């Protein structure tokens, strides 16, 4: 549309110049600059109006395709607007680090802790890089600090190859979230090493076992009072008497040993 309007603008000027050269008796007045600009602007607006009219007619003819295109454009615009920045990654990293510090070392997930420690180590050495790709953002590992003046850091022939770039990606930011960091922090308070001493069938709990009737029954039974029979009460009393007698015997033996040692020292 813009090209057609420009052609009209310049062709009008050249046509008038040719008319002056062809006819000796005809006197043509060349329009001024503002007149030509107004003509060109009017032609441009008419072209845009025709294009908008054609687009509206096509949308009325095929509303499904038009809605799909509008949805795709709106989704692309939303992704570009919600692509997280480098400050958002710093905030998410510090938040995850604070959440992990609140847990006891024995209950921390080893994979979550190792991934977070690596990110913090790279951040402390200035080797984290952030790039915004429009629809999403990437955080990747750099071999050196951005301010390093070493020969290996400045020589372009020693830079990492592009084929190795996928292995250097640490996180992907999309629609306002850092997905790899969020995935690694899932169940960060569950340490699988704590359950290694259990039998194999007790290390993994199936989803249907979490709300089973057996679990519900055991949960209710733990609040019930313990009822002991007479035999159990007599057995408990007898065991208590035996324990008290053993304590008295040990105490008497310890006192006798102390007296013997004091006599020997004299």
Swiss-Prot record:
Subcellular location: Mitochondrion inner membrane
Transit peptide feature range: 1-37
Bilayer topology: Single-pass membrane protein
GO biological process, one term: protein insertion into mitochondrial inner membrane
Residue ranges annotated as Mitochondrial matrix topological domain: 38-65
InterPro entries: TIMM29
Residue spans crossing the bilayer: 66-83
Molecular function terms, GO-annotated: protein transporter activity
Keyword terms: Membrane, Mitochondrion, Mitochondrion inner membrane, Protein transport, Transit peptide, Translocation, Transmembrane, Transmembrane helix, Transport
Primary localisation category: mitochondrion
Function, in words: Component of the TIM22 complex, a complex that mediates the import and insertion of multi-pass transmembrane proteins into the mitochondrial inner membrane. The TIM22 complex forms a twin-pore translocase that uses the membrane potential as the external driving force. Required for the stability of the TIM22 complex and functions in the assembly of the TIMM22 protein into the TIM22 complex. May facilitate cooperation between TIM22 and TOM complexes by interacting with TOMM40.
PANTHER family, per the entry: MITOCHONDRIAL IMPORT INNER MEMBRANE TRANSLOCASE SUBUNIT TIM29
UniProt-recorded name of the protein: Mitochondrial import inner membrane translocase subunit Tim29
UniProt source species: Mus musculus (Mouse)
């Amino acid at each position: 549309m813009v090209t057609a309007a420009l052609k009209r603008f310049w062709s009008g000027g050249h046509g008038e110049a040719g008319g002056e050269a062809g006819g000796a008796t005809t006197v043509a007045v060349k329009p001024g600059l503002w007149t030509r600009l107004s003509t060109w602007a009017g032609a441009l607006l008419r072209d845009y109006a025709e294009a908008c009219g054609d687009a509206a007619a096509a949308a009325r003819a095929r509303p499904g395709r038009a809605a799909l295109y509008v949805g795709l454009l709106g989704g692309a615009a939303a992704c570009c607007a919600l692509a997280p920045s480098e400050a958002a990654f710093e905030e998410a990293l510090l938040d995850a680090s604070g959440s992990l510090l609140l847990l006891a070392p024995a209950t921390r997930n080893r994979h979550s802790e190792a991934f977070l420690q690596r990110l913090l180590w790279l951040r402390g050495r200035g080797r984290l890089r952030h790039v915004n790709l429009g629809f999403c953002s990437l955080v990747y590992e750099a071999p050196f600090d951005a301010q390093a003046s070493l020969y290996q850091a400045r020589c372009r022939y020693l830079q990492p190859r592009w084929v190795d770039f996928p292995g250097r990606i640490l996180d992907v930011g999309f629609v306002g979230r850092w997905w790899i960091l969020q995935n690694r922090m899932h169940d960060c308070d569950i340490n699988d090493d704590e359950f290694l001493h259990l039998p194999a069938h007790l290390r993994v709990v199936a989803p249907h076992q979490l709300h089973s009737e057996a679990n519900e029954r055991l949960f209710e039974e733990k609040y019930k009072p313990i009822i002991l029979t007479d035999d159990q009460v007599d057995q408990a009393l007898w065991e208590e008497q035996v324990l008290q007698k053993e304590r008295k015997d040990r105490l008497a033996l310890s006192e006798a040993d102390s007296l013997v040692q004091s006599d020997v020292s004299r």
